[in-house]
Amino acid sequence: LRPELRENKGTEHVGEQEFVRHGPVIRIVPARGKHCRSIGRRMRASDVTEVWRSGRVGPVEALRRSMRQSTAFTVLIDGRPEIMYGVGDLNVLAGVGGVWLLGTDAITRNWRWFLRATAEGLPGLFTRHEVLRNAVDRENAASLRWLEWLGAAFLMEIDVHGHPFVLFEMRKRRDV
């Protein structure tokens, strides 16, 4: 999910990327407020539960807050906003950022693309930070499996509003 590294097919779009692979047209663009409404109304159930448990807010407000507090992008699948993700500052001096991703059931429908794109795009999220952290609902099994697959380290269980969450981090990889 590194928009700056994707090859454009067609016209040039500053800050936008488009690619086609035997299926839907997928574009990664800077996140906008209207994307929050579109994704929020259709957010997958596990993400709706997680944003309520972590911040006591609904899906649209969770996306708006996350977008305001980070550099955020939206994944458009066939022109429709389906996934929003970003990285914000947690501790600038220590080089720690907060990474997040929320989406619709399009993640499940396009799981092969999603796994490949997130694995390929992960290094591009480390532009300002050496470490990326966040917490995930312990009951969100799919997200825990995905984070483990990406190489996240699970640090500890924490309590957030009476619900168990798992603190995770990912470190910038260095080529030796």
Task: Describe the function of each predicted region.
Residues V160-V176:
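C-terminal "cap" of GNAT-fold acetyltransferases
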Residues P24-R41, E50:
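A short beta-loop-alpha structural element at the N-terminal edge
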Residues R128-E148, D159-G162:
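Conserved beta-strand-loop-alpha-helix junction that forms the acyl-donor binding cleft
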Residues G95-T108, W113-F114, V166:
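Conserved acetyl-CoA binding element of GNAT-fold acetyltransferases
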Residues N110-G124, R145, W149:
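Conserved acetyl-CoA-binding loop-helix of GNAT-fold acetyltransferases
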Residues V51-T71, P123-G124:
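Active-site rim helix/loop that mediates acceptor-substrate recognition in acyltransferases
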Residues S70-G88:
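Conserved beta-hairpin
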Residues Y85-A94, I158:
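A conserved beta-strand-loop-helix scaffold within acyl/acetyltransferase catalytic domains
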